């Protein structure tokens, strides 16, 4: 049996990565998928603690030990790209203790538009930016925006407040990414969240139902 599929989520500080996970996991859980979360940050495990409280302790969607925080102590992308050994070791331990797992979601610490995940760590890569950064963001390019499997543009409700044109962002994303998919989401209102979960099921899990190994 191969390893459990792994989805990496990267993006700048404050883009909404943790909230995306908090919104997507309930959709996956409602469809019967067993999910684990590994949340990286430089010096804190606060995001992991919040997700554990919200998803495990309060709602019982997964066991508490399936939400793990990793304080990397260094540059965020190092722990998910150049040297992912710490994350790999943690995930292998989780997999050994939970043979029912269908998916592991790995959150990178907030970083810049060059963030990517090592293929040794993640099988599918979601990169998230947000409208508050301005409508220039997609056309800046960068490895994260250009090469990810799915680009998400969050906080669509803030466009008018920051003078961002969603039409410009859409056109630039289409030009920069070509045939690679992207989508607009609003994690506060769940706009686009079901579609993200369906992308994960179709593309990362290859449509496999819960309890069935991929491949």
From Swiss-Prot:
Subcellular locations according to the entry: Cytoplasm
Any Gene Ontology CC annotation: cytoplasm
GTP-binding keyword on record: yes
Keywords assigned by UniProt, alphabetized: Chaperone, Cytoplasm, GTP-binding, Nickel insertion, Nucleotide-binding
Keyword Repeat annotated: no
MF-aspect GO terms: GTP binding; GTPase activity; nickel cation binding
Sites where the protein binds GTP: 11-18
Principal subcellular localisation of the protein: cytoplasm
Biological processes per GO annotation: urea catabolic process
Family per similarity comment: Belongs to the SIMIBI class G3E GTPase family. UreG subfamily.
Binding partners and assembly: Homodimer. UreD, UreF and UreG form a complex that acts as a GTP-hydrolysis-dependent molecular chaperone, activating the urease apoprotein by helping to assemble the nickel containing metallocenter of UreC. The UreE protein probably delivers the nickel.
PANTHER family reported for this sequence: UREASE ACCESSORY PROTEIN G (PTHR31715:SF0)
Role: Facilitates the functional incorporation of the urease nickel metallocenter. This process requires GTP hydrolysis, probably effectuated by UreG.
The name this protein goes by in its record: Urease accessory protein UreG
Organism: Cenarchaeum symbiosum (strain A)
Organism phylogeny: Archaea, Nitrososphaerota, Candidatus Cenarchaeales, Candidatus Cenarchaeaceae, Candidatus Cenarchaeum
